[in-house]
Structures are given as structure tokens and as C-alpha cells.
Amino acid sequence: MAFKSEYLQGVYDKVCQRNKGEEEFLQAVKEVLESFEPVVEKRPDIVKAGIIDRLVEPERFIQFRVPWVDDNGNVQVNRGFRVQFNSAIGPYKGGLRFHPTVCASVIKFLGFEQIFKNSLTGLPIGGGKGGSDFDPKGKSDAEVMRFCQSFMTELSKHIGADTDVTAGDIGVGAREIGFMYGQYKRLRNEFTGVLTGKGLSYGGSLARTEATGYGLCYFTDEMLKSMKNESFKDKTVVISGSGNVAIYATQKATELGGKVVALSDSNGYIYDENGINLDVVKQIKEVERGRIKEYADRVPGSVYTEGKGIWSIKCDIALPCATQNELNGDDADMLIKNGVIAVAEGANMPSTPEAVEKFLAAGVMFGPAKAANAGGVATSALEMSQNSERLSWTFEEVDAQLKNIMINIFHNSYNASKEYGLEGNLVAGANIAGFAKVADAMMWQGVSY
């Protein structure tokens, strides 16, 4: 048996039967349920009400075809998905991912994680996620526009400002959000906050672009201060990825006194012992949409290496910001051997279960994704508030709220871990703290017969 509790084992067995072969989703459910062992001992009312049985089953899962015409006049067909996982504390909220790896399992895993992440923010937003196996890389702007319009034509039937609010994720940036919002507005003839991550000229929020990366560093800094009386100051930092999260995590880590020496993409990684020159990275990735290897051609003394060896670089703080399961047990061993003191996840579930176990066993401070990278969805919720009020807040106002939210997420997670006898285990603490609010809401709302 994977669980001490027969009840949790039964729940997990049923999830496995109903979702055969969905490895990402099953991995996420198992990790969360393991954290609930002390909760079901202490809260028999949760078991009696079948809260966890209901929690692991989405309220709604939508799959649809997305036909579109490429620049050669050929009809292409992709799959679209939206999982509306839980709305106990507010409308569904979660991003859209456009990537060839997107499938039912990935969307369900992301939507399930979103329940707890959104709850941890303290804001009234439920959990959802969506996307498509469409790959925007190598497509013209016209092709991306036609795809986005077709995708939104179907998705618009299922979302709304008070029902389900979407946002960006991997493969969905300002361009894609703009195309989809334009199509939604044409179809529904209304200007509402149904998508977040919008451009500033049509209802977007300042600091939304920076939010996930900044929030990751605010969380990590509070974790360092509270658990080890440390900070980013004079620490060597390695960050995987070179997209939005990695870029703004690099910026904030540097502002807080750290030295970021490495970034990566799917082909390899760069190492710059003098500290990453973020202006060069932004030019390559945001303006030219190039590959990270070009950094080594432009910055003397930096080195580009093909492959996935970024975690072999000696560092004090590691921030995986690329994709799920990028950091495995061997990588964890290497980081621990090289003296890492803190790891915090900027991507969704970037560390394998084996890696997480090794970090916790070695006493490495570990900030799980659902807590550490909640800054993006928190600021999305702040964008929803601004849209509802027909107001725009200053960058400083949004950033200050973001910082407070991330500090509170750390302390709520830490306090929950302490309350249930798992002090310092923020994986369990974040799961329990996020679950508590959702469970109470579900208890109050009863069961439909």
C-alpha cells in the first residue's frame, strides 16, 4: 500500500482505475494525497463528507476539436482542452498552454494543482486549466491568429468573467491572449475580464508579466529568512529556462543581491560566472525570439553547453523554471553534493518525486510549485479585480500586493506543516493549507443529490 490510510488508498486506487495511463495526473494526485495522511486522522468529518473523493474528480472536463487553415491553404486539426476542476471558493481560474505535449493527463494535472495554488493566494478563485497540442513555434502570426480564433470560438461557450477566467501559460503570451480576447469580444459582444494577461491598452494589469518570476523570489527570500536567517545577498543562483518566469526571476534575484550564473532552453544552457547579462537575454528571447546559445556569441567569457546538465553547476539557490519533471533524482544528488541550500519551483512540478524526497531528506529548503510560483495567478486575480472596478492600479500597488501575498503563502504553508507535525516540509504544508479552505467551502455547500 502506498498510503497508511485505507481511505486515501481507496481514493487513489479509484483515481488510477478511472485515469489509466495518465502519468502526470496520477503523480500529482499521489503527491497531494500523501500530504493528507495527518489531515484524515485529525478530521474524520472530511472523510465522512467524501470531500477528497470529490476533490480528485473534475467538476467538468471539456475536449474539442480546433480546425484551422495554414498559410498554404491546408486544413489542420488540433485538440483543445479545458478542465474546470473545482469552483468551491470562486470561478475557475487557470492558464492555457499551447504545446505539442498537451494532453488530457497534463491538463488534469495542471488543473488539479491549480486548486491548491489558487486557494493559497487567499483570493476567491477556483481551479482550472486548459490548452491545446498546437505548437506556435514556426507558425506565422496569421496562422497563430487563425488558430486562436478557432480555439476561442469553441472555448467561449464554456467561460465567463464569473464562471471561468483563463490566462496564458507555455506557448500563450501577449500575442495569443490578444487574438483570443478579440475573438471572444466579437462572439459575445461584451468587454469583460474573461482573460487575464491582457495588454495594458485593453484591460491588462501592470506587473502581470513580471509576477510569476518576482513572486518566486519573494517566496524564496521569505523562506530563506524565516527558516535559516539567510537571504539572496551574495548567493549564487542557477535558474533553468529562459522564458518569462526565468527572465523575471533573474531580474528580481539580482535586485535582492543574488548572482544568477546560468539559464537554459530545451537545447542546452549558458554559464556566465560574472552573472547573467539580462539585457542580452531579453534581446535574444523577447525581441529576436532566438535560442539561448546565442548569448555565448555575444558575451565574452560565457559558455554554452548542449544538453540538460544545468544542475551540475555549483550554486546556493536553484530555481527550476522550465517544465515538469526537468529535475530528477540524479540532479538532486548533484545539487546537494555541491552545497545547495534552497530549491524553489518556478515551473509546474519541475522536480520528480524522487528529487523532492532527496531534498527534504537532506534538509534543503524546498518551495513547491503550488506555493512558490503562485505569483502569476495571484496577479491575474488582481487583474480581475481591476477589470471589475474599471480601474488600473500602479505597478507599485500591484507589486506590493504580490509581495504580501507571497509572504503570506509561505507562512500559511509553514504553519500548516508545523500544525500537523511536519515542520519545515512545505510540500505537505502547502497542500494542507490550500486544501483546508477548499474543504471548508465544500462542507458548507453540501452535496448535490
For the regions a protein language model found, what residue spans apply to each?
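Adenosine-phosphate binding glycine-rich loop
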Residues: 2-28, 223-224, 336-449
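Rossmann-like adenosine-cofactor binding region
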Residues: 268-366, 371
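Flexible, glycine/charged-enriched surface loops at secondary-structure junctions
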Residues: 23-26, 43-48, 122, 159-168, ...
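Structured beta-strand/loop patches that form or line metal/cofactor-binding pockets in enzymes
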Residues: 45-76
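General beta-strand structural signal in soluble alpha/beta enzymes
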Residues: 163-167, 190-195, 239, 262-265, ...
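Glycine/serine-rich phosphate-binding loop and adjoining beta1-alpha1 elements at the start
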Residues: 99, 118-233
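Glycine-rich phosphate/diphosphate-binding loop of Rossmann-like nucleotide-binding domains
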Residues: 204-312
